[in-house]
Amino acid sequence: MNAGAVVVIGGTGGLGREIAKHYLDRGREVVLSGRDLARAAAVATELGGKSRGIALDLTRPHEIGAALAGIGPVDHLVLSGIDRGANTVDDYDVVQGVSLATQKLVGYVEVVHALRPRLSDTSSILVFGGQARLRPYPGSTMVSTVNGGVIGMVRTLSVELAPVRVNSIHPGIVGDSPFWADKPAQVLEAFRSGTLTGALATMADVVGATTFLLENPSVNGVDLAVDGGWR
């Protein structure tokens, strides 16, 4: 029996929402977070089941502990909340850069710190990175840097928190995600032609990989790409 909740940080949209839905459909208790309480509560109501929405802003790490205070035992923790956006060196936006680094590095670790007493020896953590760490593009310096930092985070957390398992997932282009689905067909085709499978990853593919990393008791300290062999 699973005694604890599944906590999805960044669970109000996109992949985080799909992960929350997956576990709710299987009767699990799910706590999903978003920056706006009303939106998080509305998504939780829409998804139904044993779901609850909370407000949590990763860019305000000193407030994270209080935001998570009402959560009990945790079986699985998914850290998927992130902002996108180009930030070129020529027009570097320091505020945007600090915000992104705070979210994905300081904020993620503070969530783990706040929930540490509620993790059991069989709990697991999944950290979302991304393939910009290996496939940079103009304006991706900060995104590529923090996604690379996720690898170091997983390495250290898996040692420090053992036997709690910690893994990361690095999706490529997820063709049916809200971010990519409305992009021009020629753009998606260019990415598709660069994969060894000849297909873009789907949200279902990422959810399947997520459950594998969260639930397989022998998988730990792994950084998994889900990108169809993007080259």
Residue ranges of predicted features:
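Catalytic loop of short-chain dehydrogenase/reductase
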Residues: 90-91, 97-111, 121-162, 173-175
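Conserved mid-core segment of classical short-chain dehydrogenase/reductases
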Residues: 79-98, 180-183
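Rossmann-fold cofactor-recognition segment
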Residues: 46-62
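A glycine/serine/threonine-rich, flexible loop-to-helix segment
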Residues: 171-194
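N-terminal Rossmann NAD(P)H-binding glycine-rich loop of SDR-like oxidoreductase domains
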Residues: 12, 20
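Hydrophobic structural elements of the Rossmann-like NAD(P)H-binding subdomain
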Residues: 78, 126-128, 166-169, 221
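C-terminal substrate-recognition "lid" of short-chain dehydrogenase/reductases
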Residues: 199-226
